[in-house]
């Protein structure tokens, strides 16, 4: 997981999907669609927090990672007919959004939601959801391997 757009709004009010056991474990960054082989976060351990939530513990970072925390809560949700991993930073109550494009065996491909929150008039959760539903923009794809 890189440094995607962060928002004080979320795509959904609560998790809409149960834990996907295939996501549990240690994931290492293997590259992205920009042919970069380093990321803000290079390894993360995903554990089960509850029946609908994960705990993400960042275990390996690059020198450009400026964390407010190394531990996040996350959950899965269906939004706009897509499966999302929504990651919450409880320290500053912001959310990050990753579209799950592929999860098979020990391979995961995610796409970061890319919205310029400063240039858009997004001042409510309804406006945020409408914007993402109407014209989502995905930043880079990143590829991860489960250890």
Say what each PLM segment does.
Residues 4-20, 32-41, 48-147:
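Calycin-type beta-barrel ligand-binding domains and close structural analogs
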Residues 21-26:
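A glycine-anchored, Pro-Gly-centered beta-turn/N-cap motif
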Residues 28-30:
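Short edge beta-strand/loop segments characteristic of extracellular beta-sandwich folds
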């Amino acid at each position: 997981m890189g440094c995607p757009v962060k928002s004080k709004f979320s795509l959904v009010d609560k998790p809409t999907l149960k834990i996907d056991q295939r996501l549990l474990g240690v994931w290492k960054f293997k590259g992205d669609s920009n042919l970069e082989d380093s990321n803000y976060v290079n390894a993360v351990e995903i554990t089960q927090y509850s029946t609908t939530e994960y705990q993400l513990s960042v275990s390996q970072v690059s020198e450009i990672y400026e964390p407010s925390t190394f531990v996040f809560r996350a959950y899965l949700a269906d939004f706009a007919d897509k499966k999302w991993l929504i990651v919450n930073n409880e320290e500053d109550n912001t959310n990050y959004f990753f579209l799950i494009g592929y999860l098979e065996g020990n391979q995961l491909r995610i796409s970061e939601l890319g919205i310029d929150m400063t240039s858009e008039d997004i001042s409510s959760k309804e406006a945020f959801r409408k914007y993402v539903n109407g014209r989502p923009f995905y930043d880079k794809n990143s590829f991860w391997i489960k250890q």
